[in-house]
């Protein structure tokens, strides 16, 4: 599958807000479409133009309480629930990082992954991300992973 990116539309945001992930990934469910429109989100489409994922960068991708670091681009991304766990995470994250690099020209890229989400950590690791630390919010713990661009 190849991915194309576009600015997120209102219809895209409504679709994403309707996506439901199986446990324990339900924390990625997003009930509020307006949240996506208030920030700079991008929709990812497949070859047929179907919405298959989304991504965001910088402040929009940064977990609450995590400080901005000069030269570091925070990246957030999500695949449609029916496309998770089937080997698309690596190619998707690779293309998201390429888009982030093209738009923001960072020195490093950082992803913040819920500590229980071993699947996403393995995807990031396979793309050269290394664990750099941890971050904790009142709701959960996260693993910080980064790589040079």
Predicted regions, residues:
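Short hydrophobic/aromatic beta-strand or adjacent loop that forms the aromatic wall/cage
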Residues: 39-41, 139-144
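Solvent-exposed beta-strand sheet faces enriched in polar/charged residues
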Residues: 58, 110-112, 132
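Acetyl-CoA-dependent GNAT
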Residues: 7, 14, 18-82, 99, ...
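Extreme N-terminal starter segment of soluble prokaryotic enzymes
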Residues: 1-3
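Conserved beta-strand-loop-alpha-helix junction that forms the acyl-donor binding cleft
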Residues: 110-121, 138-139
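Conserved acetyl-CoA-binding loop of GNAT-fold acetyltransferases
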Residues: 125-135
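Conserved beta-strand segments that form the floor/walls of ligand-binding pockets within enzyme
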Residues: 74-78, 110-112, 144
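Conserved acetyl-CoA-binding loop-helix of GNAT-fold acetyltransferases
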Residues: 85-99, 122-126
């Amino acid at each position: 599958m190849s991915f194309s990116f576009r600015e997120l539309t209102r219809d895209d945001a409504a679709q994403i807000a309707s996506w439901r992930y199986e446990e324990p990934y339900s924390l990625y469910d997003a009930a509020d479409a307006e949240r996506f429109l208030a920030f700079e989100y991008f929709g990812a489409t497949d070859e047929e133009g179907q919405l298959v994922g989304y991504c965001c960068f910088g402040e929009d991708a940064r977990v609450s309480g995590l400080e901005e670091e000069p030269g570091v681009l925070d990246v957030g991304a999500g695949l449609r629930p029916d496309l998770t766990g089937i080997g698309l995470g690596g190619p998707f994250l690779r293309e998201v990082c390429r888009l982030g690099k093209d738009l923001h020209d960072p020195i490093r890229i950082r992803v913040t992954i819920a500590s229980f989400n071993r699947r996403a950590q393995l995807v990031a690791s396979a793309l050269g991300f290394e664990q750099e630390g941890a971050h904790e919010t009142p709701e959960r713990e996260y693993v910080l992973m980064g790589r040079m661009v």
